[in-house]
Amino acid sequence: MKITVIGAGNVGATATQRIVEKQLAREVVLVDVVDGVPQGKALDMYESAPVELFDTRVVGTTGYEETAGSDIILITAGRPRKPGMSRDDLLAMNTEIVKTVTEEAVSKSPNAIIIVVSNPLDVMTYVAYVRSGFPKERVIGMAGVLDTARFRTFIAMELNVSVQDVNAFVLGGHGDSMVPVVKYTTVAGIPISELLPQDRIAALVDRARKGGIEIVNYLKTGSAYYAPSASAVEMIDAIVNDRKRIMPCSAYVTGQYGLNDVFVGVPVKLGRGGVEQVLEINLDEADRNALQASANEVKESCEKVNSMMQ
């Protein structure tokens, strides 16, 4: 198994370290445009091998020759969010970046599965899909895994329980229009509605929607990377080990939930083939309408980037 990580910033570098520590590949190639950064970080990680006891080879490069034959391509490259900047503000500047790195990477690894982390997430996943020419099953966005992790964390904090006992699904676009599905939120199998009053549930839903910007506002000069990298690597683990995990991911829908031809967060079965199935769960009218509205927002942004990719 060979994995390429594009972007040696905080998310990419942290994801690379997690991949090698979990020994999910025989080789990981870290790519960045800034000469010296991927090489230095890769060497630093490789030097931790005797301590962490992994044999995965870590290579840093500014080119793509070393990435040839990759099984998975993780795209984290892009400009970061800054305070006061919405994900949509990133649209123009990151479209060109994701377009370029996708074309470079897939020319060397035509059979890979692409996982996109760059923001705005769902739209950048669409860019990678269009520029790669890959089947829809092999292009996936890391959205719902992270959003769900945040929602589960906030619930665990509120109830003072283990996060392991909290189950939830956050669907829709990776942004303010995401849809935390309260109907499927449980703690050790107990519906959240039996444990918290409606106003507290609503507050946690709102905090989950603003989870990314909350961290941006704290950091002032950067954005989240520990939870995003962990979420991406959880997806990689599901693919590498063919686990058939059920995860909320940004996937291309073709009629499910009444949606067509758009990348949006939905429950999927993730295995060695990438998105092996999109699961269609029952949603109440409010959640279904919210999912439709979220998908419409993504579609509007995709229409904008179509002209940028001409």
From Swiss-Prot:
The EC number(s) this enzyme carries: 1.1.1.37
Catalytic reactions on record: (S)-malate + NAD(+) = oxaloacetate + NADH + H(+)
Keyword NAD appears in the UniProt entry: yes
Keyword terms: NAD, Oxidoreductase, Tricarboxylic acid cycle
Annotated substrate binding sites: 81, 87, 119, 150
Database matches in SUPFAM superfamilies: LDH C-terminal domain-like, NAD(P)-binding Rossmann-fold domains
UniProt GO molecular function: L-lactate dehydrogenase activity; L-malate dehydrogenase (NAD+) activity
Domain of life: Bacteria
GO biological process terms on file: lactate metabolic process; tricarboxylic acid cycle
Entry annotation: catalytic residues: 174
Pfam family for this entry, one: Ldh_1_N
Residues that bind NAD(+): 7-12, 32, 94, 117-119
Family from the record: Belongs to the LDH/MDH superfamily. MDH type 3 family.
Function: Catalyzes the reversible oxidation of malate to oxaloacetate.
HAMAP family: Malate_dehydrog_3 (MF_00487)
Name recorded for this polypeptide: Malate dehydrogenase
Species of the source: Chloroherpeton thalassium (strain ATCC 35110 / GB-78)
